[in-house]
Amino acid sequence: MGNITAKLVKDLRDKTGAGMMDCKKALNETEGNLDKALEWLRKKGIASAEKKSGRVAAEGSIGSYIHTGSRVGVLLELNCETDFVARGDIFQSLLKDVSMQVAACPNVEYVSIDEIPEDVVKKEKQIEMGRDDLSGKPEQIKEKIVEGRIAKRLNELVLLSQPYIKDSSLTVEELVKQAAAKIGENIKVRRFTRYTLGEGIEKNQMDFAEEVASMQTN
């Protein structure tokens, strides 16, 4: 792997407008080759999408997805900059795909890491710090292990961090950025709600013997 310097990361950011972590990842994937890293970012749809990310996305559409068997349903709001784009095939296809992703990910609760409340992060840290396999380890080592575990756990709760169900080489965030690059507008997943049939309802469970006895008394 090539030597990934801060200057190299800055040069790539200046050329593409991509985020620092995306630039580092691109340079790592291409062994520090600036031209190849630029191409890598473009293929991922990140290079041009990042430059649009600061623009206001106030238009868009609310999509729905009902999974086969009608036991899981999703409502999702996807925003863009213009009504014209919201009606287009690329945007509508993305809306359907991201809604389907939510249906397939029952553990997902938030759109992005930034939305996770601080008390949830603290609770996860307390749980991890109390695990038996960390007892006896130096505090500094323990903190490092816990940090990695928390990051993994929090990413499991975040929609944009999920591997895309139709192509696991992409995350949902990268999928959205690709669409933004194609369209030429900022696109944001604003919010979603996932419904599961019977969720929260206490069911009266009967074992087989009780069920037979009940039928005989009726």
UniProtKB/Swiss-Prot annotation:
Residues 82-85 are annotated as: Involved in Mg(2+) ion dislocation from EF-Tu. It is found in: Cytoplasm. Its main location: cytoplasm. SUPFAM superfamilies: Elongation factor Ts (EF-Ts), dimerisation domain (SSF54713), UBA-like (SSF46934). Keywords: Cytoplasm, Elongation factor, Protein biosynthesis. One of its GO terms (cellular component) is cytoplasm. It holds the Pfam family EF_TS. The keyword Cytoplasm applies. Associates with the EF-Tu.GDP complex and induces the exchange of GDP to GTP. It remains bound to the aminoacyl-tRNA.EF-Tu.GTP complex up to the GTP hydrolysis stage on the ribosome. This is Elongation factor Ts. It comes from Prochlorococcus marinus (strain MIT 9215). The gene is tsf.
